[in-house]
Amino acid sequence: MMSREASIGIDGVYYNPAGVVFLGDGHHLSINWQLAYQDRTIENDYSLFTNNVNNPITPREFKGKAFAPVVPSFQYAYNKGRWSFQGNFALTGGGGKCTFDNGLGSFERIVAETAMAACGLARTVDGALGSVLGREVSMFGSDQAFGAGGKYSYNSYMHGRQYYFGLSLGAAYKVSDNFSVFGGVRGIYATTNYYGYVQDIKVGYMPLYMVLDPTKKDAANIELSCDQNGIGFTPIIGVDFKTGKWNFSAKYEFKTRMRLKNKSVNLVPSIGNLPANLSSQMTQILTAQFTQAGLPAEQAAAKAEAAATAVLANQTVQKTMLGLKNQFDTELDEAIGEYADGKKIAADIPAYLSVGVGYSPIDPLRINVGFHFFDDKNAKAYNNRQEKLDHGTLEYNAGVEYDINKKFTVSAGWQSTNYGLPEEEATTSKDKRFMDDKSFVTSSNSVGLGGVWHFNKKMSFTVAYFHTFYQHKKTTESVELMPGNAINYTADYSRNNNVFAAGIDINF
């Protein structure tokens, strides 16, 4: 049964620890396994994507696949008299592993906008060079170089892994035959890894590395390789009250302060080398042209160097190069700045309140409802991202469990999750935007089915399946490529999730 907040059972070590004390004296153990499979899909619509020579369509779908074949957990309780001593180990957070074989839309957007900016710079440089030489020039804007339309190609990949391992220890005390309390703590070890790249970038027919560092074919590559680790502790308290056919419970987990330390080996292009390499290329090409025109080699080289120097001194060229550098650096920082080596990243786990009510109208039938609140807006995240949420996460659930006979029990349940995501329209400012295609959530509804086979009074075997129906979250951003010329970049986020589970409960 998905709604377990008010249930009395060994899984209450996690859901309702105060209620576990109402189990009989002795040892209680539950060993569980889950298999999870998830698709994450972002559909991006951006007119510049039609400039991708290998896939000139928009909207474009970027799909990630996450598969976790083994997600283990165990719960243990030793009950003696009025006391219950408990322990729990589980993956308490993180999204498992997810791979985007073709990268992300945010990565392609950087390439597409850089291609347009590079073509703009090529036109500016060619114009300035033409003024210096007194004739029309098409050196960088020709079809054999960057071209004029912003055409591009690239290869990209993204893989992420997040695991939050939690070990909880605590004790419950039976104040009376109807009322119990719990106190405990959970230690959490977080480990994550992100690896991705954007490489082999071409603008028109020219590899981008040629104007950054012609001696290094990876000079224009973007590569992210970051490991993160952190430790946190969560105090936990709970209460349970039972009367007649009713049971009431509540649990509160305090906010967990978590700081993830980055250990990264990232590769980023240096746009700062652009002027020197443009000068070198212009000098080489012009020297060859002047030599072919009959100038002695030494005079040709001097004239070519003087022309290149004059072009780079042109204020319009300098302004255009600075604009390209600032645009690229800003977009790169937004994409991977969070993963810079040595940074400590705020990643608090929010305070969590759960409340449950259980009712058993007849002995074989149990009906539960529950409520969860995650105080996300007060859990510090990178760049205070949490402040952009409308509210913390709200969850409502309900479930029913029925004993067919002494051997078999069946159950069904439902849960609704609302993440408090803000609306992101074209006019929404950048500092108010929350969604990020590297790690995102959308509100959802989940349904689950379960069954129990009671071998005997000491042992039971459980199986379950649940599916999550995720909503679509759509965002729109207005992108001004040049003054007075804005186009929209839209994203449609969604997921698809399936989980199978099995476990064994033992009393001894």
Q: For each of these PLM feature ranges, what is it?
A:
Residues S3, I8, V71, A77-F508:
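Outer-membrane beta-barrel porins/channels
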